[in-house]
């Protein structure tokens, strides 16, 4: 059986679609699955089972990238096509059965997938390999708490100020020096955030894995105690690794994109989403200031204890 799954360009949406992939892997364990996803998200499938091919969609002008994918997939008669992008591509490919995701509003993205496709899409899953887990375990010490911290994001208005992250981590360290902060994000985010977030914190309490692959980051998440970060793909990755997750929200919709899972928590700005929707947001400015250091600290202490 040959299955084609057309995923999102975005890391977060692709992580949220891993429940779809899990469903087909479980239902058809002998199937050969081809993935189409964006270049940043494609590495999420590095360790997935049932893989036949992985195609990276690198955007081109006038949507010409779809022609590249078309010519790579047109000669195959697919048993199942799952189109999570509602693209035209799936209408031009031979198939026996087709699932096309149709977005809804006001419910979580996972529930949208489940309702639209007609099966349970909630079993988020990221596969890590033995080497990745060995590397993570080597730095995870049993006598310490380990907090994954993601201070970045792809949109400045939803990023909590780095100075507040630093103050919050200092406060945590002062209350319990048996804690290690695992800093995650891209190599570019390392340049932007590493110095300021780690100021006045002993280097032995910092584990810097900025720039590591998504699956290596996931391996660290699987052996850690808690995640704190902005609304982001790495926040969804944390949920997929079954790590307790606290996420900070302001001008984005936590009802749709909040951390999936019963034990996970959203800390919102004092302003609600309607407030932000009425504003002409400055793309170079954070709108997360009304979330206080103490507010985040108290929630972290509650979860870590």
Regions found by a protein language model. Name each.
Residues 1-305:
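Catalytic machinery of carbohydrate-active enzymes
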């Amino acid at each position: 059986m040959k299955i084609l799954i057309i995923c999102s360009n975005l890391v977060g949406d692709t992580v949220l679609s891993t429940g779809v992939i899990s469903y087909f892997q479980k239902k058809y364990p002998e199937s050969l699955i081809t993935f189409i996803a964006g270049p940043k998200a494609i590495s999420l499938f590095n360790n997935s089972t049932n893989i036949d091919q992985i195609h990276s969609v690198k955007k081109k002008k006038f949507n010409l990238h779809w022609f590249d994918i078309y010519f790579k997939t047109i000669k195959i008669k697919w048993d199942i096509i799952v189109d999570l992008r509602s693209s035209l591509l799936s209408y031009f490919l031979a198939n026996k059965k087709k699932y096309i995701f149709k977005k809804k509003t006001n419910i979580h993205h996972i529930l949208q997938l489940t309702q639209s496709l007609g099966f349970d899409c909630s079993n988020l899953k990221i596969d890590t390999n033995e080497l990745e887990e060995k590397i993570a375990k080597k730095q995870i010490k049993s006598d310490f708490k380990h907090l994954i911290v993601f201070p970045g994001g792809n949109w400045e208005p939803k990023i909590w100020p780095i100075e507040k992250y630093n103050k919050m981590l200092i406060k945590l360290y002062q209350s319990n020096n048996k804690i290690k902060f695992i800093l995650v994000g891209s190599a570019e985010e390392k340049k932007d955030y590493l110095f300021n977030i780690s100021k006045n914190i002993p280097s032995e309490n910092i584990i810097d894995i900025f720039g590591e692959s998504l699956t290596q980051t996931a391996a660290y998440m699987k052996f850690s105690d808690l995640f704190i970060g902005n609304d982001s793909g790495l926040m969804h990755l944390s949920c997929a690794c079954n790590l307790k997750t606290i996420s900070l929200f302001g001008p984005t919709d936590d009802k749709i994109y909040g951390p999936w899972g019963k034990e996970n928590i959203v800390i919102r700005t004092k302003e609600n989403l309607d407030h932000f929707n009425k504003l002409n947001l400055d793309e170079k400015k954070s709108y997360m200031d009304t979330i206080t250091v103490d507010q985040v600290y108290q929630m972290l202490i509650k979860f870590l204890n």
